[in-house]
Swiss-Prot record:
It holds the Pfam family ABC_tran. GO terms for molecular function: ATP binding; ATP hydrolysis activity; transmembrane transporter activity. This is Metal-staphylopine import system ATP-binding protein CntD. The keyword Ion transport applies. The keyword ATP-binding applies. Induction: Repressed by zinc.
Amino acid sequence: MTLLTVKHLTITDTWTDQPLVSDVNFTLTKGETLGVIGESGSGKSITCKSIIGLNPERLGVTGEIIFDGTSMLSLSESQLKKYRGKDIAMVMQQGSRAFDPSTTVGKQMFETMKVHTSMSTQEIEKTLIEYMDYLSLKDPKRILKSYPYMLSGGMLQRLMIALALALKPKLIIADEPTTALDTITQYDVLEAFIDIKKHFDCAMIFISHDLTVINKIADRVVVMKNGQLIEQGTRESVLHHPEHVYTKYLLSTKKKINDHFKHVMRGDVHD
């Protein structure tokens, strides 16, 4: 069953009249993971943020975005707020930017839960701890009492994921959630998303420029370049049998980097 339909989506900078995204079309079914790939500036993040109205006001959006039967572009800001978190959760690229540095992460998470649920304080704490345990965050009560600066980037990222899961959304949008992390933490966070894909009944849009990450988690893939969606299809078709020259370029570039790394590790590279 289709959960999200995006038709003829166009995003324009109203200050300059410059189109940033042009005529983008894609769908997402319930429980499916859609990978969105492209280089920086390709329009992938603003395309996905437009689903829940998180772009700056200067960006004008036209077209059609239908989420679970509702026209998202026709909603007011107050109506959109009811969807954010509860129905559509977003995991940002940098956990440090998602939390207010002046108060504890627990207080912020509790406030979000109170806005979107009718749970008591005790129920909220129990639910958050349950998902923090699920994401291997040790000593959750201590973490909830901590300020953001006291926690690592990986821990903050997993806290965002825990909060998203606690709200039981129909869709999680993950905007390059592994980019700002070290390699080991990247692996842990990616494994968490893969596990969510297996055990939770929610769709995901996973934005990344890392083809390895997308290959591990996506069911279908869309490729963006200069604000246009240039190719889409199953993970197998796009990443292993691409048709567009740009997709082929991305894959060949990644292969060259991987081959060079293998040569270096074997000691084959000389000055």
